[in-house]
Amino acid sequence: MNEKPVLGIQDIQNLLPHRYPFLLVDKILSYDLNTRSVVAQKNVTINEPFFAGHFPGAPIMPGVLILEALAQAAGVLLGIILENDRDKKIALFLGIQKAKFRQPVKPGDVLTLKAEFSLISAKGGKAFAQAFVGSQVVAEGELSFVLVKKESI
């Protein structure tokens, strides 16, 4: 599944502070401000730095990085929503509840990252997020974010 993005890597870098090797979203396939949802994609390649040690001979993407990719996808949507305050505020990943890892993610997989916010306020937000490889859910959880002034970090 190599769909045309609505936001490419340059747009994502304008919305997120992350950079290689920690930028874990390659493109945004869709977003909807009414449903407060986003669909993103991460192409998982054997060249990812974490595969050198996780695990030699049987590489799998660390689950915590799948959750981080989900948080970054949700963070892109928060960046779009923050439009007028983007230069002043930043969303920080605050926590995860009910995280589940269902399948391993391997080199060559395409991760589809989906998040839908149940709450967005001036202080932060909460989203349910799922990562897929094809139609299989590989990870999911409830993500929490806090909005802080950029100058405070």
UniProtKB/Swiss-Prot annotation:
| This enzyme's EC code(s) | 4.2.1.59
Q: Which GO terms describe its molecular function?
A: (3R)-hydroxyacyl-[acyl-carrier-protein] dehydratase activity
List locations, semicolon-separated: Cytoplasm
Q: Major place of localization?
A: cytoplasm
Give a Gene Ontology cellular component term annotated to this protein: membrane
| Family matches, as Pfam families | FabA
Reactions catalysed: a (3R)-hydroxyacyl-[ACP] = a (2E)-enoyl-[ACP] + H2O
Q: Name one GO biological process term.
A: lipid A biosynthetic process
The active site lies at 54
Q: Which domain of life is it from?
A: Bacteria
Q: Does the keyword Aminoacyl-tRNA synthetase apply?
A: no
Q: Which UniProt keywords apply?
A: Cytoplasm, Lipid A biosynthesis, Lipid biosynthesis, Lipid metabolism, Lyase
- What is known about what this protein does? Involved in unsaturated fatty acids biosynthesis. Catalyzes the dehydration of short chain beta-hydroxyacyl-ACPs and long chain saturated and unsaturated beta-hydroxyacyl-ACPs.
Family affiliation: Belongs to the thioester dehydratase family. FabZ subfamily.
Q: What is the protein name stated in its UniProt record?
A: 3-hydroxyacyl-[acyl-carrier-protein] dehydratase FabZ
State the organism named in the record. Chlamydia trachomatis serovar D (strain ATCC VR-885 / DSM 19411 / UW-3/Cx)
